[in-house]
Amino acid sequence: AMLFSTLIGTVVGTVSGYFGGWLDNLMMRAVDILMAIPAFFLLLVVNAYLKPGVDNIILIISLLTWMNMSRLVRAETLSVKEREYVLYARASGEHPLRIIVRHIIPGVLPTIIVAATLNIASAILMESTLSFLGLGVQAPAASWGSMLNNAQSYIGEASWLAMFPGILIL
């Protein structure tokens, strides 16, 4: 889920930050509108309409978490596009796509890697919450949330059934 989220956020943020102007305004206002919707509420509503499964969970989480990545990548792109090597590439007549791929993305990549790594935790928390509520991954597949849900009835006799998945989720 974070791979798709990172790809969507990187494309939107890079295009918005590099080209600027009315396109940047339009894209970032759309991102602001999407960020104003509570993600967990939307996660529950969309998941109620779709069949619970791994593919749908990946799709839902990736479509709900790309906005923060796009804002971060846009901010870094605004910084990187003013560096000398990017200005020289633009002055030499390179195509904007080539400048983005060869100069902007490598400059933004460390930030993308750190942000994607930190966002994995929120994706795990979203998935385990859905599975705990019974809306996530179904029985044959293992999920920490479904393990916690199943361990509720045995909490007095076998507390370790809930302890280990709970610790791993935290």
Model-found features: residue ranges?
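Alpha-helical transmembrane segments of integral membrane proteins
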Residues: 1-170
